[in-house]
UniProtKB/Swiss-Prot annotation:
PROSITE patterns per UniProt: RRM (PS50102)
Keyword Nucleus: yes
Range of residues in the leader sequence: none
Record keywords, A-Z: Cytoplasm, Developmental protein, Differentiation, mRNA processing, mRNA splicing, Nucleus, RNA-binding
Protein name: RNA-binding protein 38
Domain RRM: from-to ranges: 11-88
Natural source organism: Xenopus tropicalis (Western clawed frog)
Task of the protein: RNA-binding protein that specifically bind the 3'-UTR of VegT transcripts, leading to maintain their stability and stimulate their translation, thereby playing a role in germ layer formation. VegT is a localized maternal determinant essentially required for endoderm formation. Also has some proneural function in the open neural plate and in the context of retinogenesis. May also act as a mRNA splicing factor. May play a role in myogenic differentiation.
Length: 219
């Protein structure tokens, strides 16, 4: 004859955070004030026989289990434990995690902004991406001279604020390599003169280092 197993969904309690000296008897002694107990067991290690720090208590009825779980963090055998219905799982001792507390301490203005930075530290796209600073589609770059009109029209869509922040001698912190003294495309006279002197094809940035002709080389 098979016995009908009792439904313990709302009567079986998980008890965590127990001290290692807690036994079945001491666990039962604490919970018996809430009502009749069917079972009280402290889970122990099979090899050492020592407590693993948690156990289960099955109350006789649902009302007794609700009274036992009213205090989620009772003091059992001198230590703060955590109590919850077993089917709900272990309940943390503190509902607010460290991450939640840390986020609450931040100012809402920093949470809403990207990367947690204020607007004056967010560089415009023209500064963040060096490839965008000088538009690549300049047809005249294939020729020895730079088309001043095409280069000027390509720069009209940039704002004045973004253009003024561009460093002439950028530091590694901004993501650029140091160019020394550079001459931008908006100076066609310097670019044309350098091209005619050196014979090298113009690039987006031209090294502006005037060379002095030596008298002995011209002889």
């Amino acid at each position: 004859m098979h016995t009908v197993q009792k439904d313990t969904t709302f009567t079986k309690i998980f008890v965590g955070g127990l001290p290692y000296h807690t036994t079945d008897a001491s666990l039962r002694k604490y919970f018996e004030v809430f009502g009749d107990i069917d079972e009280a067991v402290v889970i122990t290690d099979r090899q050492t026989g020592k407590s693993r720090g948690y156990g289960f208590v099955t109350m006789s009825d649902r009302a007794a289990a609700e009274r036992a779980c009213k205090d989620p963090n009772p003091i059992i055998d001198g230590r703060k434990a955590n109590v919850n219905l077993a089917y709900l799982g272990a309940k943390p001792r503190n509902l607010q995690s460290a991450f939640t507390i840390g986020v609450q301490q931040l100012h809402p203005a920093f949470i809403q902004r990207p990367f947690g930075l204020t607007p004056q530290y967010i560089y415009p796209p023209a500064i963040v991406q060096p490839s965008v600073v000088i538009p690549t589609p300049i047809p005249s770059l294939q020729s020895p001279y730079i088309d001043y009109n095409a280069a000027t029209q390509a720069f009209t869509h940039y704002t004045t604020a973004a253009y003024e922040q561009y460093p002439y001698a950028a530091s590694p912190a901004t993501g650029y390599m140091g160019y020394g003294y550079t001459s931008a495309v908006q100076q066609p006279l310097s670019a044309t003169t350098t091209t005619a002197t050196t014979g090298a094809p113009p690039t987006a940035y031209i090294q502006y280092q005037p060379q002095q002709l030596q008298p002995d080389r011209m002889q």
